[in-house]
Amino acid sequence: MGNFIDKTFTVIADILLKVLPASKQEKEAFSYYRAGMSAQSKGRYAEALQNYYEALQVEEDPYDRSYTLYNIGLIYGNTGKYTQALEFYHQALSLNANLPQALNNIAVIYHSQALRAQSLEEDEYIELSKELFDKAAEYWIQALKLAPDNYPGARNWLKVTGRLSDNN
C-alpha cells in the first residue's frame, strides 16, 4: 500500500508542478521536497535529509519550510537523534504553530525520556522524570487543542495522571 501511495503522490505532484503557476525557485524547492518524501518513505534517510536540506536552501515560504523542517525532525526522531528532532520540531512550530503532529512528537520524546529516567529509580532521576512528564503533558495539551479528535492515547494518559482538566 505504501508504494501505491508514494507513486500516487508522485504523479499528483508532477501534475501540480505543471499546471499550477509557480516560480522556478518554488518548483525547485518542491522537487527537492518531493524527492525527500519519496526517499523517506523508502527508509533512505540520508538521501531524504540531503533533499530536505536542499529544499530549505531555496524555499522561502514559511509554511512550506515548516513541513520540510517537520520531516527532518521525523527522520532524526526515527533514527534516535532526539535532541536534533526536538530542534527541528521547534523550528517548524516557530514558522507554523498549527502543527499538532509536531507537538505530539515532542510530547512523545519527552514522555519516552521520562520513562527512561524513571526506570533509574534514583532521587535525581525521579525528579527529572516528573519534569519530563510535565513537559510531555504540556505539549500533548497543545496538540489536543489543535486536533481534539486525535491522540486518544495521549488524552487518556493526561486524564489518568490528572494532567487534563476541563479547562485544558
Swiss-Prot record:
Lineage, top-rank taxon, reads Eukaryota
Question: SUPFAM superfamilies this protein is in?
Answer: TPR-like (SSF48452)
Which parts of the chain are TPR repeats? 29-62, 66-99, 117-150
**Where in the cell?**
Plastid, Chloroplast thylakoid membrane
Question: Which residue ranges run through the membrane?
Answer: none
GO terms for cellular component: chloroplast thylakoid membrane
What keywords appear on the UniProt entry?
Answer: Chloroplast, Membrane, Photosynthesis, Plastid, Repeat, Thylakoid, TPR repeat
BP GO annotations: photosynthesis
* InterPro entries membership: PSI_Ycf3_assembly (IPR022818), TPR-like_helical_dom_sf (IPR011990), TPR_rpt (IPR019734), Ycf3/AcsC/BcsC/TPR_MFPF (IPR051685)
- What is the protein's membrane topology class? Peripheral membrane protein
HAMAP family membership? Ycf3 (MF_00439)
Per its database record, what is this protein's job?
A: Essential for the assembly of the photosystem I (PSI) complex. May act as a chaperone-like factor to guide the assembly of the PSI subunits.
Q: Which family does it belong to?
A: Belongs to the Ycf3 family.
Q: What is this protein identified as?
A: Photosystem I assembly protein Ycf3
